[in-house]
């Protein structure tokens, strides 16, 4: 389940989720501000840039791909190289403060604000576990296990690993 932000202007039509963009449910404009430089944010930015969009990633941390579970070193190097190759601008140590009609207002760690123009703002600031289905089925199915993103938002490797562990130990 995606983490939602509560900021001024976040309800505007130009604000989209990375999941909606990747699933094809929503289309972006030509210039895109990607809020969140984690793995899904960077992969979404790359997807958009390969489609001809002008993309800027804004990340609150010191570097992109530094939140959450570490990714394999060679994958990280390749992804960073691809972001550069496709001309994706990266702005670190900044956060989204507000969505405006023309784009957004960012704020850095020294509380300096800057306005940026963007047709679309794509939000990808993380995920949290979703136990809705598990809770609905708990007590109704004898052998029900909480794994994958229902247990903890992570990546496909963790989901497969936990399923394998349960399969081997049942």
Model-based region annotation:
Residues 36, 59-61, 148:
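Short beta-strand/turn micro-motifs composed of small residues
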């Amino acid at each position: 389940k995606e983490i939602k932000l509560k900021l001024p202007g976040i309800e505007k039509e130009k604000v989209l989720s990375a999941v909606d963009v990747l699933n094809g449910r929503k289309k972006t404009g030509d210039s895109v501000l990607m809020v969140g430089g984690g793995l899904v944010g960077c992969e979404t930015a790359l997807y958009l840039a390969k489609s001809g969009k002008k993309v800027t990633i804004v990340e609150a941390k010191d570097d992109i791909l530094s939140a959450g579970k570490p990714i394999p070193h060679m994958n990280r190097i390749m992804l960073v190289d691809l972001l550069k190759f496709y001309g994706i601008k990266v702005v670190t140590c900044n956060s989204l403060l507000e969505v405006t009609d023309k784009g957004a207002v960012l704020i850095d760690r020294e509380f300096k604000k800057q306005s940026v123009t963007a047709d679309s703002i794509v939000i990808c600031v993380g995920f949290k576990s979703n136990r809705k289905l598990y809770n609905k089925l708990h007590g109704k199915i004898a052998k029900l296990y909480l794994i994958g993103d229902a247990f903890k938002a992570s990546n496909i490797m963790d989901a497969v690993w936990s399923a394998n562990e349960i399969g081997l130990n049942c």
